[in-house]
């Protein structure tokens, strides 16, 4: 089943979901705690309505795990007998009547513990845990990680088929100027046609289709913290894959020194003569005081060496620029519900 169909099935609002009883001992933390590379348990007690029955699940209840596969998102279901089961199926319950109440990402490598990147041991990303009251604001929480309990970031760079894969998936072709993404159905896509390139405009539009945004400079600096600074990968990665040296504290993978990512910020030169400029691809014109409107690139690319890093940024490129070393990464707000 495609991500697009998953999103179409997500018809209830978050508040409607919570209205079906889900009450944790505290709303100030996520329900789950990582207890090992591939194990987890509840870290607070919770009462959950499953069908017509309210089930009490105590703190310290283990989640039954399947054989975990690196780079995969798992849903956590509460069974009618009170047990917890993780599966990689996010739409069909593992047993009749089970209710999905959270999930996590099983990453291909560990998060950074200092400012020297992560490791290559596949494990649960503890910052990817979510539940019905602690989650990203976008409809689909998969492939995301919580940055400093402030906002959520896509773990992976944008891929070429986000309607199928979501905007953040492991082992797929990275979207860039040479391999632009398919136009999302929300903006008239037919499942086949791609953008002509990957300009700032396309980046913002793609993420908007899934309830996300490109990061601000401040957000990027935070999400990329913990990478091995002033280093690059050395070659075009082509696909979303582990680059442990440039994994951040929060488990953002290929965070720097792989492909540049478009930012949300734009700047305009206030000098010269202001005129209307036809630079918005047939969707109106932009009044600026210089030849163009500029946007930021963050993180550094695979050949940038010491220029790459969590605070690396370029501010000299037009919003209409597109190239093979420019991609995107989505972010969205953090939601806490009582």
Language-model features: locations:
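Glycine-rich, flexible loop motifs
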Residues: 12-72
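Acidic glycine-/aspartate-rich tracts in secreted/extracellular proteins
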Residues: 80-84, 157-160, 227-228, 265-268, ...
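Short aromatic-cysteine micro-motif
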Residues: 107-253
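Disulfide-stabilized, aromatic/cysteine-rich ligand-recognition loop
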Residues: 197-198, 286-338
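An exposed tryptophan-centered "aromatic clamp" motif
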Residues: 209, 219-303, 333
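Short, intrinsically disordered N-terminal pre-domain segments
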Residues: 1-16, 336-338
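Elongated alpha-helical scaffolds
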Residues: 69-84
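Short, surface-exposed terminal/edge motifs of secreted or surface/virion proteins that either
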Residues: 80-94
């Amino acid at each position: 089943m495609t991500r697009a169909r998953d999103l179409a099935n997500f018809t209830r609002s978050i508040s409607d979901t919570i209205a079906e009883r889900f009450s944790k001992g505290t709303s100030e933390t996520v329900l789950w705690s990582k207890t090992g590379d591939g194990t987890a348990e509840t870290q607070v007690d919770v009462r959950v309505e499953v069908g017509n029955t309210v089930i009490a699940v105590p703190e310290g209840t283990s989640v039954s795990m399947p054989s975990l596969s690196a780079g995969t998102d798992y849903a956590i279901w509460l069974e009618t007998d009170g047990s917890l089961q993780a599966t990689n199926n996010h739409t069909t319950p593992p047993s009749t009547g089970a209710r999905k109440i959270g999930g996590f990402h099983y990453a291909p490598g560990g998060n950074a513990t200092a400012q020297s990147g992560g490791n290559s041991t596949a494990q649960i990303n503890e910052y990817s845990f979510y539940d019905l009251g602690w989650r990203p604001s976008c409809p689909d929480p998969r492939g995301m990680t919580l940055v400093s309990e402030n906002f959520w970031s896509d773990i992976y760079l944008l891929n070429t088929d986000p309607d199928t894969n979501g905007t953040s998936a492991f082992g797929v072709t990275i979207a860039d100027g040479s391999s632009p993404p398919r136009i999302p159905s929300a903006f008239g896509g037919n499942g086949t046609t791609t953008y002509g390139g990957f300009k700032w405009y396309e980046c913002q539009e793609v993420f908007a289709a899934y309830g996300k945004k490109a990061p601000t400079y401040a957000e990027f600096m935070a999400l990329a913290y913990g990478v091995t600074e002033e280093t690059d990968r050395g070659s075009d990665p082509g696909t979303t894959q582990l680059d442990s040296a440039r994994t951040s504290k929060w488990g953002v993978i290929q965070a720097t020194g792989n492909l540049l990512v478009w930012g949300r910020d734009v700047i305009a030169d206030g000098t010269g003569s202001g005129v209307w400029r036809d630079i918005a691809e047939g969707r109106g014109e932009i009044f600026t005081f210089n030849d163009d409107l500029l946007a930021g690139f963050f993180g550094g690319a695979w050949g940038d060496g010491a220029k790459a890093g969590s605070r690396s940024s370029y501010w000299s490129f037009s919003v209409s620029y597109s190239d093979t070393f420019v991609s995107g990464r989505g972010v969205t707000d953090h939601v806490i519900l009582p």
